[in-house]
Design a protein with these regions (language model features):
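A structural signal for multi-pass alpha-helical bundles of membrane permease subunits
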Residues: 1-227
Length: 227
């Protein structure tokens, strides 16, 4: 037999708030997550690439190895390690924060409570972004290191004669010459993170749950691919 659905599913989606609102929340979060990850890892990678290629820095090769090392570790292992570090009850990160922040809050007559990384929406999203930044910055750093090598030193020497500061060099020489070759890779990175199912599934499973989503179970850290 044949059932004619037509536009019924679209009508149901648009008219049912318990389905529409979680979907819109997840869509906005997915776009923000992808964009923040791309530009965040690019910024971290560029800064680190500039530092490890600074001619006055000693042991640059050693620093390069240690900074690229996270890229050699399988992502699912790193995610599971971070899941333990962020554990709300016995994770090392909360223990460290409790040790540091507890006395500071106590000095003002306040009580410090452990951060609920897995049960509160915004801490969970912040955790997702931090873990993804750790996973993504080595890739961006490697790209920036290669592209920085391709920029002629004559340009920097000419601006040095004019008295240009490092900030001016970054704005008018480094970034313009980096963005064009990086653009396709940034778009590819955005698309990858837009569908980053493994990170969400292993770290939070999409949680914490959106209470309003009664007919379509959804979580605050869900991406469209895991919704």
């Amino acid at each position: 037999f044949k059932v004619n659905i037509g536009f019924k599913n679209y009508i149901k989606f648009l008219s049912n708030e318990s389905i529409r609102m979680p979907f819109l929340q997840i869509f906005v979060w997915t776009v923000c997550f992808s964009a923040i990850t791309v530009f965040g890892t690019l910024a971290i990678g560029l800064v680190l690439a500039c530092l490890v290629q600074w001619e006055f820095l000693r042991f640059r090769g050693v620093y390069r190895v240690f900074l690229i090392l996270p890229y050699a570790v399988p992502s699912f292992i790193s995610i599971l390690v971070f899941k333990g570090l962020f554990n709300q009850n016995f994770g090392e990160l909360n223990m460290f924060l409790n040790t540091i922040m507890g006395p500071i809050y106590g000095a003002f007559g306040l009580e410090w409570s452990s951060i609920e990384w897995f049960t509160s929406p915004w801490p969970a999203r912040a955790m997702i972004l931090m873990v993804n930044a750790w996973l993504g910055y080595p890739y961006m750093m490697i790209l920036c290191m290669g592209l920085l090598k391709s920029i002629p030193d004559d340009l920097y020497e000419a601006t040095a004669i004019e008295g240009a500061t490092p900030w001016i060099n970054l704005r008018h020489i480094t970034l313009p010459l980096l963005i064009k070759p990086l653009a396709p890779l940034l778009i590819a990175s955005f698309a990858f993170n837009f569908n980053n199912f493994v990170l969400i599934q292993l770290l939070t499973g999409g949680g914490p749950d959106i209470i309003e989503a009664t007919q379509a179970p959804a979580g605050y850290t869900d991406l469209l691919v895991s919704f």
